[in-house]
């Protein structure tokens, strides 16, 4: 008598996905992305002009790397969340969890940019319409 292993059917193939709407494909910047990009552009311009305030701001931002945004109140005015809050419609008050997530994302983005920018003052480390982080990592 021979034993045969039970036949396991192959996994079902997922149905073909419908194309994403053009608004999703376009990678339209949301209010958080716009706020962070504007803050970084301002800091970057000032840093390249050797503004003492920008040099100090980048030094402070670098100290925030690896720390939670809630642990670094000295950075709260440097990250650029003010523009994000101003862009929120009056009839939409984001949940506390959404706000915390946005603050954390902005904190990580700006502090890591500050570290990266320090490596080469003459070169702009943040470029508009440049490769996304995922694209850059794949290269």
Residue ranges and their predicted role:
Residues 2-93:
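The feature captures two recurrent sequence modes
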